[in-house]
C-alpha cells in the first residue's frame, strides 16, 4: 500500500494546479483522513517557482490550522513525505456541492437544481463561515461548489485555502498568479487579485446560490 508519511493511502480524491488530495488512513487508530500533498504542475512550477509554491502551501496549512469554526475545514498535521514534499492532514468529508449539483468540468452544462429552502440553509452556513473569515481579515478568493464540502449531516464546510488572501499580511502569493475560477470570480479579482476585500467572496457566493437555484450560471442562456 502506498504511504504518505505515516498515513496509508486509500485513493486519490482529486488533483489541482498545486497538488493532489488523497483519502488516507491513520493505521494505529483506524481513522480516515484527507491529505493534501504539494505536487505542482510543471507549468505552474516554472512560472512561480518551487520555493514560492512551498511558501504558499505552508501559508494555507497554517491558515487552516488556526480555524475553530464549524463551517470551515481544519488542518491538524503537517509533515513531508519521503521525497521531501510537504503535505497536511484534514478531516475527511466524502461529498462536495459540485458533485451534489452535477457541475461538469466545462461549467457551461446545466446543473441540478436544489430546492429553495435547502439553498437558503446552505447560504446561511456559507455566510456564517465567511463572516468568521472576514472578521479575521481572510479573503478566500476561490468560493465555488467543489470547495464546499457536505457532511453526512448536511453541514457545509469551506475548504481549499490555497488562494486565500490575509489582509495586512505581506505574503499572500505572487502577483502573477491567476486567482479564482471562471464564472465564480468577480471582474476586479481577475484584474487586481491582491487588492480585493470580502465583497469578492460575496460575489462568488451569489453566483453559487444562483447556480443551485436555477441550474445555470449568470449570463448563460437557458
Predicted regions and their residues:
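Conserved short submotifs of the Hanks-type protein kinase catalytic core
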Residues: 83-96, 100
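Activation segment signature within eukaryotic-like protein kinase domains
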Residues: 122-123
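AlphaC helix of the eukaryotic protein kinase fold
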Residues: 42-66
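A short, aromatic-enriched beta-strand patch in the conserved N-lobe beta-sheet
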Residues: 77-79
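Protein kinase catalytic-loop region centered on the HRD/HxD motif
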Residues: 128-138
